[in-house]
Structures are given as structure tokens and as C-alpha cells.
Amino acid sequence: KQVFRHGKIINANLQSSGGNERVTYLVGGGWYQEEGIMYGSEFKRANLITNINMKPRKNLSLDARLYLSYSDRSRGSGSSGFGDGKAIERLTADPKQTSSLLPADGEVKDRLLQLLNSKVDKAYSYNIRSSLNLGYEFIRGLKFTTSISANYTEARANTFSPSYLDQQNNLSKSIGQMEGNMILQNEELLSYKFNVKEQHNFDLLFGFSYIRTSKNSMYGSGAGSPSDKIHYVLSGFNTTYTKAGEIVA
């Protein structure tokens, strides 16, 4: 009971679709929540998808798609590894270090559990994907299509260590990170299909594609929060630096 628990999974999805000869649509949403057999292994995800297909004229078509998702991988303890899981999640006992000879209750056990479970990890990620496609047929066989799509992903993480874990300075520490990635793509195509004497088929294709990617990341840390209830760096926090691989004030 100190190390494992009963796992639980909730997976709910709702979808609706319909339309007519000119317009069709599909809208769906989902929620996924998992509580693993190890303490602190919770995972949550929500997503929404929308597809719309339009054909206002016989030679004109329009497709639009949108996808949104949010995931939460927050944990009650652990290192500040950005987006990475740990071999030992939020346990009430550390099977790699805790001796089986220790008593069930007492100061030793309380201190061990305090060190193990007091750190707080927050990890969130967002994803937005959208695309728009337009097709127009000038004459039979001659068709022009243009499309534009974008994909943006952002992940954020924060690790907080309360003041009572710092035996030297009695200062809380907070480490925050953010990373964002974006991909933008545009494509223009002109195709022409024809045949000669219904025996020789030809398919000509002209076009170009443009792709642009961008990436940005931020990192910051601070110490000396006025309260262990405040887990994020605010104005007035002490500056920090790295010493022997540790964040110190």
C-alpha cells in the first residue's frame, strides 16, 4: 500500500457528424484520465477535433481542420527533468533506498517521507494544429489547389522545493522552463490530366512548397519565496546560480 495502489482509467469520447451535398462536418471531443499503480503517475489529456468540408460550386472545394489538445503530467515529487518521467514516481517509500529494517512509524520515517514527497513538479503541454485547403477546377482536368497548415506545441514545467528541505539557508527554490515549437507550411499545386485518343494518359504537375519552423525556450529559477504556498518565481525573489550541480541562492 505504501508503494502501489489500484490503477484507474477514465476514457470518454463524444462525436457528432452530418451535413448535406454541399457541407459536411465532424466534431469530436475526448477526455482521458489515468491513475497508474504507482503514486504520482497521474496523466490527463483533453482533445477537440473539427473537420468541415464545403463544396459551394461543382468546381470549387474547401476543407478546414482544427485539432486542440491539452495534457497534464504534473507530479508531487521528483527532479526537474523537463518532460521526462522518473523510474520512481511519487512513492510513500523509496524501494531503492529504504531499508526494510526501519520501524513502521517514528521520526526517521516521517523525515524520509517528507524529503521524498515534498517537491512539486508541474508539467503541462498544449498542441494546436490547423489546416485549410482550397481547390478550383478551371476546366476539365486543369485543377489548382492551395493549402496552408500550422502546428504549434508548447510545454511548460515548474519544480518547487519548499524551504524546510534547505537545511543550510532555509530557502525555497523554484525552477521554471518553457519550450515552444511551431511549423508553418504552404503548398501551391497546378495539375492537368488529359489523354490522347483515349489511349495515352498524361498527368502534369507543377507547384512549390514552403516550410518554416521556429523554436523558442526559456529557463529561470529563484529562491526565497515568502511562503511555501507560492511555487512560482515572483518579483523580489533572490537570484540563483549553479554550484556543484545544484541551484543555490
Q: What is each residue range found by the language model?
A:
Residues 1-39, 77-80, 114-122, 135-137:
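Residues embedded in well-ordered regular secondary structure
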Residues 141:
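Active-site and adjacent substrate-binding regions of carbohydrate-active enzymes
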